[in-house]
Amino acid sequence: VSMNEQQVPQTISYEEDEIDLRELFGILWAEKWLIIGVTAVFAIGSVIYALMQTDIYRAEAVLAPADAEQSMGGLGSQLGGAAALLGVNLGASGGDNISTAIATLRSRQFIGRFIEENNLYVPLFAGQWDKSTGTGVIDPEIYDAVSGTWLLLGGRPSEQEAYRAFSRILSVGGPDRTTGIVTVAINWHNPDEAAEWVNKLVSAINADIKTQDVSEATSAIAYLRNQLEQTQLVDMQRVFYQLIESQTRITMLADVREEYVFKVIDPASIPDVNVEPRRSVIVIVGIFIGGLLSLVIALFRQKSGLTLAKK
């Protein structure tokens, strides 16, 4: 077979590709106003949709584990066995306490109590943000601020609904494996409330874990003193005195430390730039979909026209 014969199919293929491209560009040119019109409609629609979306702001606090360890160090290792037998907690290590605090921060009980104590039902379910005035307002169709009455069909939202609503806007990250850094953030349409709630959450979790530890230590001290009075063994009395000392240290530490579990490295500040929605992305996606759809319609119209012409 000669080389000229081998080149013939390739030449025909190139010519067919060139014809197909010319035909495609011809179709696009013939349907240019349709393509422009459909794409423009989608572009305008995506712009309107993007502008109608509520701005969401992110307030974030950066936290580190409190410096002082609640564990008793060498004393803890010496008395760990005796404390375990007596059911006495010598104080969680830093890592364990952080894990407990994060789990508590996400818990249904803690969040429910936080919402109730800070009266967050109204802003959580009826709150809105007025861009023109830069202030939070209440939706009068959901809550009557004058009479204090909920206008929803079932009245005030339930605790479960409040927990789910708050969990959706709450984000807890960490701890970082290297630094132990933890972040607490809230994404919310009201930037003032977002920053306020984050800072209150940090204070609340520190106070909550402190209260738990003090309560456990106080109960342990009372129990150990009772056991001390009942034993005559000198060695056991020495152990009880050391355990009482360890529990007393916990209560004293709690008295002098406000930042009991988390030390605030960077408190939440009022954000001035929204994180959502990403309006430019919405518009670009809208234009892309409009352009793609217009091409499909144009090709379908041309194909239908050719089919009818052949018939």
Name what the model sees in each region.
Residues 235-241:
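Disulfide- and glycan-decorated extracellular loop modules of small multi-pass membrane proteins
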Residues 1-218, 241-243, 247, 252-311:
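Hydrophobic and amphipathic membrane-targeting/association helices
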Residues 223-234:
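Short, low-order "capping/linker" segments at domain edges
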